[in-house]
Amino acid sequence: MVINSSNVAVTADFSRAHGTLIVHACTKAMTAPVEWVLADLTKAPVKLDWYNQTISPSMVRASFEWSAGSGMAAKIASGLKAIPHIRFEVTEMSSGPDFNQRFCFTPGLGIFRADVN
């Protein structure tokens, strides 16, 4: 998997799923661990564009588009949920028989998964 100039992770074999990670809020100190999780999963360096979260001044936000094999959204959600004070959602749209899915996470409520169409 490689990261193109638009900061989109793309697999060399054009796998069957793509999606978006939206980090709604994360402390500035945890931005590097978020990028490390994504780099570990994509096997390529990841540098996100972080923006101040206007609702919570001590937090930042970012988004990341990816393309990979089916199941990548679950891997991203599993990797990120261990990061303190993060709030995110990740979607996966599959071109095969697998379900499209969305994972949402907040520290107080934990992780939520739903099939989407």
Where do the PLM segments sit?
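Long, contiguous binding/interaction regions
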Residues: 2-18, 22-60, 67-117
